[in-house]
């Protein structure tokens, strides 16, 4: 039997007792959708590791957070005024957080993260663009983790880098480095 799975399957990595699940942008686009995600996780405790996308479209003509972040990064790279674009992103997260009764603290954390990313080095525009765009998933994960905790589920936000995910530095063609897979198995130990 050929196993093309990049994760070693052995006594420490029993895929039958733990599930890793990914929820796309539509699944985390609104508070109502995040509540559905929570229901799925609550109903099946074997879902131990959750990966989420940036909030997607809530309705047909809506704008995805990723598209907002692309506009924000482009404006920043061109040296244009960015406050309106930044407010648009923060407001989307604030709407979700408010509807989940999460309070202002999580929004302050997200705003600080976005401002830190916007103030980062722009000498490599592609890398700047990628790291700002990646904030969509990262900040979505923060909201989901806080919400899950608020309803009594054990949840912990883990930054992908802290989890062991290492990537190349090819702008807009980022891929996980092979050594990431062994590092990510340590995440299973925590789950």
Where do the model's predicted regions map?
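Nucleotide/pyrophosphate-binding catalytic subdomain
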Residues: 7-191
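Short hydrophobic transmembrane-like helices used for membrane targeting/insertion
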Residues: 1-2, 9
């Amino acid at each position: 039997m050929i196993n093309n799975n990049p994760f070693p399957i052995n006594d420490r990595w029993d895929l039958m007792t733990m599930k890793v699940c990914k929820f796309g942008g539509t699944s985390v686009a609104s508070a109502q959708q995040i509540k559905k995600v929570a229901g799925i996780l609550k109903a099946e405790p074997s879902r131990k590791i959750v990966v989420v996308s940036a909030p997607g479209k809530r309705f047909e003509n809506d704008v995805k957070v990723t598209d907002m972040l692309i506009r924000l990064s482009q404006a920043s790279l061109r040296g244009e005024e960015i406050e309106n674009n930044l407010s648009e992103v923060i407001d989307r997260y604030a709407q979700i957080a408010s509807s989940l009764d999460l309070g202002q603290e999580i929004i302050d954390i997200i705003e600080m993260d976005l401002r830190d990313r916007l103030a980062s080095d722009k000498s490599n525009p592609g890398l700047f663009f990628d790291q700002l765009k990646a904030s969509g998933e990262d900040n979505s994960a923060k909201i989901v983790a806080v919400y899950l905790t608020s309803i009594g589920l054990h949840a912990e936000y883990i930054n992908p880098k802290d989890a062991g995910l290492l990537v190349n530095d090819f702008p807009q063609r980022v891929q996980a480095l092979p050594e990431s897979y062994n590092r990510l198995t340590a995440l299973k130990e925590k789950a």
